[in-house]
């Protein structure tokens, strides 16, 4: 055993024995080198090895810390079977009942689609918004119509460039949140009655858009760890005249899955070979827990077939409703559809976010947000282990703020939703994530709020209800 491996094993034993607990800082490189009589390079090699094994993680300018994720005691949810038919979509009534459930401020919002506002820099944004409103040039009503505020588009393009993706700001269109971007993309490439490949389970807003546009869904199974099943998608592309594919490639809602880079590249190539556009919903991309943001599928697009959609709603400012789309070869058509519907998003909101991106410390905010979300995930996973049946299967995503739970087979998540709501707890039942209303024994839980005694009590109550089935 090499010296760095021996030192790594010594630290690993301290973690396994509980001497170094989850979230606790491990000795600094300098301290470890002096205390244990090893060179700094040996310590670095040991820590790198422990990081690869998932036992510790580095925080920029803070050192190394014990990973909050112990090896998961849960099995992964089972991958759904492929449905070999297209289907019309009718889920809105069910979705609206879930959305209504989170309006009561006294309800524990495990069914919400947003993180807590407490996690966002709202006072700093408010100052930017007030300044933008005071200084707004009346001519911006004309000059900042679609494609949107030039400074904001420039800032977004710069963030992509830092991540290694050269995305010209001329391709970027600012929208009223990502949902409008996704609507516009579908309208640009489909007609009523067309077939669209979607994930199963899929974000319910995707299903509602298909329902509104009178499109049919072809459901493709999703693996809880690495995303959409490419073999199933390839079969569907051979069998059906699919006009578009809509997928979340990073930290998918509701499962939390992220396609590895090679799989994203394969997805783009598969769709390119059939000349089918990919609508990439990438709204959770900034909420990664590791050291590096996942690369979007758009990075592998060479023919302009990927329509990449993003938003600040999940990472910075939910109420501002500012999103964007880089629509590739469809950019002009999408922009014209935008001009025919809502002209442009709020100009003060665009200017405020542009100012914050330039001056407000967005990356510092994101580091704090990611850390908070990862800690909250650990708290919810621990609560599930304490209170839920042993056969519960749980996803464990490396970003975002959702867990997908597959409960014992006899559990009816629609009844569970009503029973939990009567106790002041909102959840998202599985059937709202499927065009065919499958996943009856599954639920999605949101851990995007600071963990409190009320959160813990709600999980205990929820676990007790699940056990009653």
Each language-model region and where it sits:
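Short beta-strand "wing" residues that participate in macromolecule-binding interfaces
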Residues: 57-58, 167, 427
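Conserved core of the PLP fold type I
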Residues: 136-274, 286-303, 373, 463
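AMP-binding (ANL) adenylation modules
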Residues: 433-437
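Conserved PLP-dependent catalytic core of the aminotransferase class-I/II
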Residues: 354, 366-392
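Conserved core segment of the aminotransferase class I/II
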Residues: 302-371
């Amino acid at each position: 055993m090499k010296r760095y491996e021996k030192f790594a094993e010594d630290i690993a034993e301290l973690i396994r024995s509980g001497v170094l607990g989850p979230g606790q800082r491990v000795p600094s490189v300098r301290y470890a080198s002096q205390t244990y009589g090893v060179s700094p390079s040996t310590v670095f090699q040991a820590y790198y090895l422990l990081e690869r094994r998932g036992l510790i993680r580095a925080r920029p300018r803070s050192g190394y810390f014990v990973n909050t994720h112990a090896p998961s005691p849960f099995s992964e949810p089972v991958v759904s079977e492929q449905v070999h038919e297209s289907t019309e979509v009718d889920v809105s009534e069910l979705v609206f009942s879930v959305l209504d459930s989170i309006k009561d401020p006294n309800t524990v919002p495990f069914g919400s689609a947003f993180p807590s506002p407490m996690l966002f820099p709202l006072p700093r944004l408010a100052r930017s918004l007030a300044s933008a409103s005071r200084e707004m040039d009346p001519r911006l009503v004309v000059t900042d119509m679609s494609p949107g505020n030039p400074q904001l588009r420039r800032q977004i393009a710069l963030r992509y460039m830092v991540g290694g993706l050269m995305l010209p700001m001329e391709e970027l269109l600012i929208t009223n949140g990502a949902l409008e971007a996704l609507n516009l993309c579908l309208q640009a490439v489909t007609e009523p009655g067309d077939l669209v490949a979607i994930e199963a389970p899929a974000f319910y807003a995707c299903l509602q858009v298909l329902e509104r546009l009178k499109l049919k869904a072809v459901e493709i199974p999703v693996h809880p760890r690495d995303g959409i099943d490419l073999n199933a998608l390839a079969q569907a592309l051979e069998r059906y005249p699919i006009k578009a594919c809509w997928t979340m490639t990073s930290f998918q809602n509701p499962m939390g899955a992220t396609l590895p880079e090679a799989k994203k590249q394969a997805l783009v190539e598969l769709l390119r070979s059939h000349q089918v556009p990919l609508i990439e919903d990438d709204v959770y991309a900034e909420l990664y827990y590791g050291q590096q943001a996942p690369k979007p599928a758009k990075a592998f697009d060479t023919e302009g077939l990927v329509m990449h959609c993003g938003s600040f709603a999940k990472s910075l400012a939910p109420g501002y409703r500012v999103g964007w789309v880089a629509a590739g070869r469809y950019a002009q058509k999408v922009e014209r559809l935008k001009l025919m519907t809502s002209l442009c998003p709020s100009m003060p909101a665009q200017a405020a976010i542009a100012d914050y991106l330039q001056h407000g410390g967005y990356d510092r905010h994101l580091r704090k947000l990611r850390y908070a979300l990862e800690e909250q995930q650990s708290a919810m996973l621990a609560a599930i282990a304490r209170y839920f049946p042993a056969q519960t299967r749980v996803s464990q995503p490396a970003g975002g703020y959702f867990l997908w739970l597959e409960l014992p087979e006899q559990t009816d998540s629609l009844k569970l939703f009503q029973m939990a709501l009567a106790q002041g707890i909102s959840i998202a039942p599985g059937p709202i994530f499927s065009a065919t209303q499958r996943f009856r024994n599954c639920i999605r839980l949101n851990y995007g709020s600071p963990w409190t005694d009320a959160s813990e009590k709600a999980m205990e109550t929820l676990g007790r209800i699940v056990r009653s089935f």
